[in-house]
UniProtKB/Swiss-Prot annotation:
Species name: Methanocaldococcus jannaschii (strain ATCC 43067 / DSM 2661 / JAL-1 / JCM 10045 / NBRC 100440)
EC category name: oxidoreductase
Transmembrane segments annotated in the record for this chain: none
Protein name (record): Putative glycyl-radical enzyme activating enzyme MJ1632
Cofactor(s) this protein cannot do without: [4Fe-4S] cluster
Keyword 4Fe-4S appears in the UniProt entry: yes
Family, per entry: Belongs to the organic radical-activating enzymes family.
Annotated Radical SAM core domain residues: 30-245
Reactions it catalyzes: glycyl-[protein] + reduced [flavodoxin] + S-adenosyl-L-methionine = glycin-2-yl radical-[protein] + semiquinone [flavodoxin] + 5'-deoxyadenosine + L-methionine + H(+)
CDD domains: Radical_SAM
Cofactor note: Binds 1 [4Fe-4S] cluster. The cluster is coordinated with 3 cysteines and an exchangeable S-adenosyl-L-methionine.
This enzyme's EC code(s): 1.97.1.-
Amino acid sequence: MLNTLMLREWLRSMLRSCISKIFGDLMLISHISLSDKITLLTYGCNFKCKYCFFKPLSCKKYSVDEILNKILEVNENYKLDKILIAGGEPTLQNDLSELTKLLKDEGFYLMLSTNGYYLKDMLDKLEVDEIHIDLKAYDENKHIYLTSCSNKKVLDCISYIGKYRDEFNFKVEIDTVLIPNIVDLDEIEKIAKFLSNWDLPYRITGYVKYNNNLNAEKPDEDKILKAKEIALKYLSNVSCSLDFKRHKKSKKVII
């Protein structure tokens, strides 16, 4: 298992290096959507999550200046002041930090949604207001089963942010999808215990069946509330998908 993981890490590193060399100052963008905020979805991910719902069929290559101009053009009709950068996995984009700087200079409130795998190495360069890290599982074997990737770098990144939290100028939240019989109540408790070292904000979202890659069903409301109750034994700030709808209905803009 160790040799296999090392090979995977090497291949991922080589792939990321190749992407950087090929695209240079270009970013791969699928589309943007608009509701109470602009959501910019980047293309590509280093994880292969079994329950991933984001399967774009195409993307385009844009420089950060072109992306900024497109956002400003589209936003003329909406006058929104918040932008969520998600994916895919945004941290695969070579010029993410440059894009965040340009958007902040325009006065936008920036949120980044990431799996946290490559995040630690770019924390000092990003100019964002919020970072949401999706921790799939605390147990490494479960994480590998769900994503085909180890969670060691993700846990290390969360630990680093927790330790130096007061030195960063962004809010942070850790998110987990509650998946019955896989990432169940016992796993939620392990994650909550881990996060309690720094009392990081935690959000639990109920799994929604998108494909047949997981032998799992949507958790009922009682289970979601129980998961929240368990997490609150260790953390002061816990929310769940029953508390409010985070994503309002949006209009897709293909760019």
